[in-house]
Amino acid sequence: RTDTGVHAEQYFFHVDISKDQDFDSLLNRLNLMLPQEILIKSYEIKNPDFHARFSAISRTYEYRISQKKEPFLNTMFNHISHNIDIDLMNESCNKLIGFNDFTSFSKVHTEVNNFNCHVYEAFWTKKNHQIIFTIKANRFLRNMVRAIVGTMLLVGRNKISIQDFCDIIASKSRSSAGPSVKAKGLFLTKVNYNNNG
């Protein structure tokens, strides 16, 4: 599942159906029925206990920013024209790595009671006028990536310090963090599973 407006380059779902199917034909028929924005690329037959959401061991997201107005990429990049210090934001990324309570970057009204996530990697890259944030973790909270990016941009614009960023994480308070960025720049890019199953 992703937040409304978020893109997915790799996404999985599971369905329980009879094995007595022509799966190639089924795949083609499903793609004919789906809207233009959605394409089923392939299928695999899995063990009965496989669950597309709960069997995943990690997920990777990217948040894409363009510092130049690009009409043809408007739905895929968030346009932010401010000067941004990538080095400072990468320094703040180091504070995310490991097992942390990410309450500060979660939706305020949520049914979730476990806010701990293990972040394996987080970094910013820049190519020409495009800036991309990549983050990989075992799980994500609703709105988490967008809130992290919004807060890191405050670091990158020298509105808050690295220590402030650490204090925000430690506060476990959403009101301490920065605003969430728009959903349109966020992409689910990879979902990892164990080989068995």
Please provide the spans of the model-predicted regions.
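Structured-RNA-binding interfaces characteristic of tRNA pseudouridine synthases
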Residues: 1-197
